[in-house]
C-alpha cells in the first residue's frame, strides 16, 4: 500500500482505525441488495443492513442476470455502505417541514448508475406520497443511459433524468429543497473492489479531485433554496476531499453544518460527517456530511426560450390512455412517441425542460403505429400501471428468462394482442400475442446476452 496513502488515511480516521482498514483491504468485497418496497416479491435470504430497512447482505454473489425479478426492478444491487447516504437522507427528510401547495424538490446531482437515486425515490414516496419530484442528473453521456434504464426498472414516475453540467443548475435559483451531491472522487473507498483505483492514486489526483468537487458544489449552490439541505458524499477517505471540503462549503458558500450524531454500528464519526471503512463495516468506503444553506439566492433566471419538444408529424394522442394508470397523468406526443408525467408535476417538468437536457420524465407510454399505440417496455415496469390495463400472463422461471433473452415464446391460451408478461406477480414487459407465437417488445438494449 502506498505510504503516502497510509498517511492520508491515518490523518482521516486515526492510526489505530487505519490499521484495521489496511488489514481489510485484502479481504473479499461484500455483496448486498436493496429491495424495492413498491414491488413486492418473495423474501430473499440475507442478513439485514442495520441502517437500511430494505437492505440485505448476501453470503455469496448469485447471478443477478439470471434472476427475472432483478429485471422487473424488485431490487437494486447496491453496496451497503452506499445505503448509509440514503439513511442520512431519510433522517433529514423525516425532520424537514414539507412545502405546502407544491411538491418537495430534490436533486441527485451525480446520479449514475442510479443506486442512490432509487434509494431516495423510495424514501420520498414513503414520506411524501406523490408530493415530490426527484431530478437525477448525470453529466457523462456514456453513463446517463444506464441511469435512465435503472430509473425505468425502479418504476417511479416522479423521477426526471437529466444530463447537464452542474453549471446549468445555477439558472434554477433556489428551486431545490434538498440536493445530494455524490461527487467524483479519488476512489479510496473502492480499493478492495478496484485495483485500478489503487494504481491511479496519487497526492496530485487527490488535489485535483478536491478542486473539482469545490467547483461542482459552487456551481450547483445557487439552485439550492435558502434553508435547503445539501448532503455531500464521496467514496473516499482523505480529509481533503471530505471534512475539509465540507468546511470550505460552510465558510465560503454560506451554510451551517448539521449534526453528525447518528450512532450506527461500525460507522466512524469524523469532525463533520461520517466515514464508513472496510474492517468496521462489511461494505466499501463511503463518506457523507450534511449542511443547511444559510445564504440567500436569486430566483429562477428568466428570459430563456423553451427547448423545442419536436414535431408530432400530425399524429394525435389517442383517447383512453388515462385507463392505463392509477394516477391522473398529463400526456405528451413527440414524433410518434407518447409520454406521460403525473399531472401535479407537469408544470415542474415543463419548466425543467426549458433549462435542462431532460432525458426522461414520468413514464414512456408507447409508440404510435398509425392509430395503434404499441406499449412501451417502461410502462410495464411503472409502479402506477393499472393492474387491469392489459391482460397479464404469469410465466415460470425458464420462460421468463427466454422472454428476457428475446427468444420466441408461445402463450396460445392467453388473449391475442398486447399481453403483460409477469413472473412471481411482477411485470417483466409486453408481447404481442399472435396465438402460435409472440412478438417480443422487450428492448434489445436490455436483453440478457449470456447463455441461459
Task: Indicate residue ranges for each PLM-predicted region.
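Polybasic, low-complexity RNA-engagement segments
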Residues: 1-40, 284-287, 294-452
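Conserved SAM-binding loop of SAM-dependent methyltransferases across substrates and taxa
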Residues: 113-129
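Mobile active-site "lid"/loop adjacent to the S-adenosyl-L-methionine
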Residues: 142, 174-219, 235-242, 261
Amino acid at each position: 500500500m502506498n505510504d503516502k496513502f497510509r498517511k492520508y488515511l491515518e490523518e482521516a480516521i486515526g492510526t489505530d482505525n487505519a490499521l484495521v482498514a489496511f488489514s481489510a483491504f485484502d479481504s473479499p468485497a461484500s455483496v448486498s441488495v436493496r429491495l424495492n418496497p413498491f414491488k413486492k416479491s418473495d423474501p430473499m435470504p440475507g442478513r439485514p443492513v442495520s441502517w437500511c430497512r430494505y437492505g440485505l447482505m448476501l453470503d455469496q454473489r448469485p447471478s443477478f442476470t439470471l434472476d427475472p425479478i432483478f429485471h422487473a426492478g424488485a431490487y437494486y444491487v447496491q453496496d451497503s455502505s452506499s445505503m448509509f447516504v440514503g439513511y442520512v437522507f431519510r433522517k433529514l427528510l423525516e425532520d424537514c417541514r414539507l412545502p405546502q401547495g407544491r411538491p418537495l424538490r430534490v436533486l441527485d446531482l451525480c446520479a449514475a448508475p442510479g443506486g442512490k437515486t432509487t434509494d431516495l425515490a423510495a424514501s420520498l414516496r414513503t414520506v411524501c406520497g406523490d408530493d415530490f419530484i426527484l431530478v437525477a442528473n448525470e453529466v457523462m453521456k456514456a453513463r446517463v443511459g444506464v441511469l435512465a434504464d435503472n430509473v425505468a426498472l425502479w418504476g417511479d414516475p416522479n423521477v426526471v433524468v437529466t444530463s447537464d453540467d452542474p453549471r446549468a443548475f445555477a439558472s434554477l435559483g433556489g428551486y431545490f429543497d434538498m440536493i445530494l451531491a455524490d461527487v467524483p472522487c479519488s476512489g479510496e473507498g473502492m480499493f478492495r473492489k478496484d485495483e485500478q483505483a489503487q494504481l491511479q492514486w496519487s497526492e496530485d489526483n487527490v488535489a485535483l479531485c478536491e478542486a473539482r468537487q469545490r467547483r461542482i458544489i459552487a456551481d450547483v449552490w445557487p439552485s439550492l433554496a435558502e434553508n435547503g439541505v445539501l448532503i455531500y458524499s464521496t467514496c473516499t477517505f482523505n480529509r481533503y476531499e471530505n471534512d475539509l471540503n465540507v468546511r470550505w462549503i460552510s465558510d465560503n458558500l454560506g451554510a451551517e453544518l448539521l449534526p453528525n450524531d447518528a450512532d450506527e454500528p461500525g460507522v466512524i464519526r469524523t469532525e463533520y460527517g461520517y466515514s464508513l471503512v472496510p474492517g468496521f463495516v462489511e461494505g466499501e468506503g463511503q463518506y457523507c456530511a450534511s449542511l443547511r444553506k444559510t445564504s440567500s439566492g436569486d430566483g429562477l433566471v428568466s428570459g430563456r426560450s423553451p427547448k423545442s419538444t419536436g414535431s408530432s408529424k400530425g399524429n394525435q394522442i389517442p383517447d383512453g390512455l388515462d385507463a392505463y394508470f392509477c394516477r391522473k397523468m398529463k400526456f405528451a406526443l413527440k414524433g410518434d412517441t407518447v409520454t406521460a408525467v403525473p399531472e401535479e408535476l407537469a408544470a415542474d417538468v415543463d419548466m425543467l425542460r426549458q433549462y435542462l437536457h431532460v432525458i426522461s420524465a414520468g413514464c414512456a407510454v408507447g409508440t404510435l403505429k398509425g392509430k395503434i399505440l404499441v406499449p412501451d417496455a417502461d410502462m410495464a415496469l411503472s409502479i402506477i400501471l393499472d393492474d387491469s390495463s392489459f391482460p397479464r400472463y404469469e410465466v415460470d422461471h425458464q420462460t421468463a428468462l427466454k422472454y428476457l433473452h428475446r427468444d420466441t415464446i408461445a402463450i396460445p391460451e392467453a388473449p391475442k394482442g398486447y399481453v403483460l408478461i409477469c413472473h412471481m406477480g411482477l411485470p417483466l414487459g409486453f408481447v404481442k400475442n399472435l396465438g402460435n407465437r409472440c412478438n417480443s417488445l422487450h428492448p434489445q438494449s436490455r436483453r440478457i446476452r449470456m447463455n441461459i
